[in-house]
């Protein structure tokens, strides 16, 4: 494999994971903060808020996992080589 192509693939893989983690990380922080605020205001709705929060966090985390999969494809099954 061309060394330039290999180094570009490594940089692209690092950017894929890094950029894919920024948005969900910020979103998870905001969602968790709002859930804590909602539970503090209405403690009787804790179960419903927590269930919705966990489902939402799982969907947000899937975006990061997609970035990880793309980076693994770039590193080990490089379509450009």
From Swiss-Prot:
Annotated organism of origin: Gloeothece citriformis (strain PCC 7424)
Gene Ontology terms: cellular component: plasma membrane-derived thylakoid membrane; proton-transporting ATP synthase complex; proton-transporting two-sector ATPase complex, proton-transporting domain
Keywords: ATP synthesis, CF(0), Hydrogen ion transport, Ion transport, Lipid-binding, Membrane, Thylakoid, Transmembrane, Transmembrane helix, Transport
Function: F(1)F(0) ATP synthase produces ATP from ADP in the presence of a proton or sodium gradient. F-type ATPases consist of two structural domains, F(1) containing the extramembraneous catalytic core and F(0) containing the membrane proton channel, linked together by a central stalk and a peripheral stalk. During catalysis, ATP synthesis in the catalytic domain of F(1) is coupled via a rotary mechanism of the central stalk subunits to proton translocation.
Transmembrane parts of this sequence: 6-26, 57-77
Swiss-Prot/TrEMBL site (Reversibly protonated during proton transport) positions: 61
Main location: membrane
Assembly with partners or alone: F-type ATPases have 2 components, F(1) - the catalytic core - and F(0) - the membrane proton channel. F(1) has five subunits: alpha(3), beta(3), gamma(1), delta(1), epsilon(1). F(0) has four main subunits: a(1), b(1), b'(1) and c(10-14). The alpha and beta chains form an alternating ring which encloses part of the gamma chain. F(1) is attached to F(0) by a central stalk formed by the gamma and epsilon chains, while a peripheral stalk is formed by the delta, b and b' chains.
Name assigned to this protein: ATP synthase subunit c
Family in the record: Belongs to the ATPase C chain family.
UniProt topology in membrane: Multi-pass membrane protein
Superkingdom of origin: Bacteria
Cross-referenced SUPFAM superfamilies: F1F0 ATP synthase subunit C (SSF81333)
């Amino acid at each position: 494999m061309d060394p330039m192509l290999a180094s570009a693939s490594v940089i692209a893989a690092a950017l894929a994971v890094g950029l894919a983690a920024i948005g969900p990380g910020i979103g998870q922080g905001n969602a968790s903060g709002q859930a804590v605020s909602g539970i503090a205001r209405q403690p009787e709705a804790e179960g419903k808020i927590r269930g919705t929060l966990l489902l939402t966090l799982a969907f947000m985390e899937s975006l990061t996992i997609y970035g990880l999969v793309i980076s693994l494809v770039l590193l080990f099954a490089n379509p450009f080589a």
